[in-house]
């Protein structure tokens, strides 16, 4: 038998390579830190923009200027993982690049917080554990001079159309899901509150004088419900797990990995909650995402946009097998529906 030449196969291979389908619409993720192009000590804030235009702010914290920060743009939803001041925003950045990456120059944002200032300025919905939503709703009321209403809902009772006409409350409990869509979109962004293992007490400086007097004799703070993370399901298929501040816990496997199946995650560092070994294990053995975004470093984590040698961030990144990217301030990353970073990731 004489073998036939495979000449005709080459053009077919070339055609197959040339017609690989494009990645499709992407979710844009933009960190808002204290120093452009770096991941710094106090950096927390992150904006997620769905292909349909829904824009979500996660943990405004202290690396923003407040409600008038020009980097924000439109914000439809404000997320808050827990009540600590570095997430709620008991301080604000005095100016972009003020101070150093390790020690940025901050000023008080009490009693209103940066989260409330942004929600008030942007007419955003407060999407978080009920107690925190109610607390921030009163701060929004103080800013705007009128009570903060519940967010209008659609026929399903847990769906919302953005933009809202005014700041509003969309609090929920652990496990609760709300959907946010633009008027002409077929689908919306689904946001589910998931467990975290941490503390969620509010700084006394943010409380009323009467409440402070009640707590100070026993050196107590006020808990605002359980801490949380989020699973955000975008319309292009990206499923992003936002860990919040948390230690390793069993619900990461049962609730987050097995049920929600995220394909990307934002992992908060911080010595009080997570070790390098446990952080790497969460990424590589529990969640197993296509991409891990490192945030909340509690150190000057980068130099010229690269992990600072000898830092905890560099050490943990080196331990992970997943693709690791730093949440560099002002650098917009783009993610496809499989959790792959297609642009903006070093």
Regions found by a protein language model. Name each.
Residues 265-281:
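A short, conserved beta-to-alpha structural element at the edge of catalytic cores
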Residues 37-42, 64-65, 84-89, 132-137, ...:
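Active-site environment of divalent metal-dependent phosphoester hydrolases
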Residues 53-57, 61-136, 142-148, 155-156, ...:
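Active-site metal-binding motif and surrounding structural segment of the metallo-beta-lactamase
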Residues 117-185, 279-346:
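Binuclear metal-ion centers of metallo-dependent hydrolases, dominated by the metallo-beta-lactamase
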């Amino acid at each position: 038998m004489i073998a036939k030449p495979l000449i005709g196969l080459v053009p077919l291979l070339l055609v197959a390579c040339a017609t690989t389908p494009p990645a499709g619409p992407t979710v844009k993720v933009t960190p808002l830190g204290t120093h452009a192009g770096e991941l710094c000590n106090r950096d927390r804030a992150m904006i997620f923009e769905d292909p349909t235009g829904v824009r979500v702010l996660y943990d405004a914290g202290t690396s923003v200027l407040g409600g008038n920060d020009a980097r924000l743009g439109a914000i439809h939803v404000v997320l808050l993982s827990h009540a600590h001041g570095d997430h709620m925003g008991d301080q604000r950045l005095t100016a972009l690049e003020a101070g150093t990456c390790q020690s940025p120059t901050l000023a008080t944002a009490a009693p209103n917080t940066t989260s409330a200032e942004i929600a008030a300025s942007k007419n955003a919905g407060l999407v978080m554990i009920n107690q925190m939503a109610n607390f921030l709703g009163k701060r929004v009321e103080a800013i705007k001079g009128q009570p903060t209403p519940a967010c209008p809902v659609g026929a399903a009772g847990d769906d919302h159309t953005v933009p809202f006409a005014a700041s509003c409350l969309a609090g929920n409990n652990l496990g609760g899901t709300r959907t946010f869509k633009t008027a002409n979109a077929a689908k919306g962004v689904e946001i589910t509150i998931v467990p975290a293992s941490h503390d969620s007490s509010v700084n006394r400086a943010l409380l009323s004088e009467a409440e402070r007097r009640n707590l100070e004799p026993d050196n107590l703070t006020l808990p605002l419900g359980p801490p949380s993370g989020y699973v955000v399901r975008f319309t292009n298929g990206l499923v992003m797990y936002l860990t919040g501040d948390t230690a390793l816990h069993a619900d990461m496997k049962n609730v987050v990995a097995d049920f929600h199946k995220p394909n990307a995650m934002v992992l908060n560092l911080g010595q009080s909650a997570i070790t390098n070994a446990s952080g790497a294990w969460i990424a590589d053995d529990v969640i197993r995402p296509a991409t891990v975004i490192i945030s909340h470093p509690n150190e000057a984590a980068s130099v010229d946009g690269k992990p600072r040698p000898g830092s905890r961030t560099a050490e943990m990144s080196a331990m992970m097998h997943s693709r690791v990217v730093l949440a560099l301030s002002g650098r917009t990353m783009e993610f496809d529906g499989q959790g792959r970073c297609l642009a903006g990731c070093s």
